[in-house]
């Protein structure tokens, strides 16, 4: 939804480009009321269709900073650091308040395109603690949660098309079902994991 909004919402990206200061595009994006309402409605309806706790995956604050800046200044070369990531986390934390009533159980921040210092997440940790959400970070082969301290292996999405298990699958795993997976085959492969 975030990528689609950045590529298709011309009115919003125009507003995001009004100032070139680092973080302005992200701040404008995260504070847009229409986007906030649409994101909240999508998450709320997704949670309501499940009978188990739902954890929402998002880009890391640093990745959000890169994505929003790239959306309005695609030809510039950027180099953001951990301080920029922490500033971005402030805007993200404010945006996350939108999901207060959605009944999500936690958040996973995708760091596959670049790790973020744990301290940079402090604004988000404060919000998560208030709402009693768990926080994890996704890396290439694992999802790491700090409180409680848990590491969950990532089952590659190719499993859902090949059936080949490349990791130990006892206990919890994290996975994404491949777009080209056949639904009946997915059900069979899911049974193999049990």
Q: Where do the model's predicted regions map?
A:
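Active-site-proximal, glycine-rich beta->alpha crossover segments in alpha/beta enzymes
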Residues: 5-98
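Aromatic-lined carbohydrate-recognition surfaces of secreted/lumenal glycan-active proteins
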Residues: 56, 109, 129-146
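Generic structural signal for hydrophobic
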Residues: 46, 99, 128, 189-190
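An N-terminal, globular interaction/scaffold subdomain
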Residues: 1-7, 152-154
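Catalytic-face loop-and-helix region of soluble metabolic enzyme cores
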Residues: 137-194
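Alpha/beta enzyme core
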Residues: 88-107, 124, 133
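Active-site-adjacent beta->alpha loops and helix N-cap segments on the catalytic face
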Residues: 115-121
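Active-site-proximal loop/turn and secondary-structure-junction residues that shape catalytic pockets
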Residues: 1-2, 58-62, 113-114, 141-143
């Amino acid at each position: 939804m975030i990528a689609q909004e950045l590529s298709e919402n011309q009115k919003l990206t125009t507003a995001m480009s009004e100032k070139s200061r680092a973080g302005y595009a992200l701040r404008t994006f995260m504070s847009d009321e229409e986007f906030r309402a649409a994101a909240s409605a999508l998450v709320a309806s997704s949670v309501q269709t499940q009978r188990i706790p739902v954890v929402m995956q998002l880009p890391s604050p640093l990745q959000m900073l890169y994505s929003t800046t790239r959306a309005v200044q695609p030809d510039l070369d950027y180099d953001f650091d951990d301080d920029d990531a922490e500033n971005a986390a402030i805007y993200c934390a404010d945006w996350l308040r939108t999901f207060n009533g959605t009944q999500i159980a936690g958040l996973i921040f995708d760091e596959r395109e670049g790790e973020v210092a744990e301290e940079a997440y402090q604004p988000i940790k404060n919000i998560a603690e208030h709402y009693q959400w768990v926080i994890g970070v996704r890396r290439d082969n694992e999802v790491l949660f700090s409180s409680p301290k848990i590491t969950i292996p990532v089952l590659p999405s190719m499993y859902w098309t090949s059936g080949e298990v490349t990791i130990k699958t006892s206990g919890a795993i994290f996975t994404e079902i491949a777009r080209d997976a056949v639904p009946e085959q997915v059900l069979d492969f899911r049974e193999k994991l049990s």
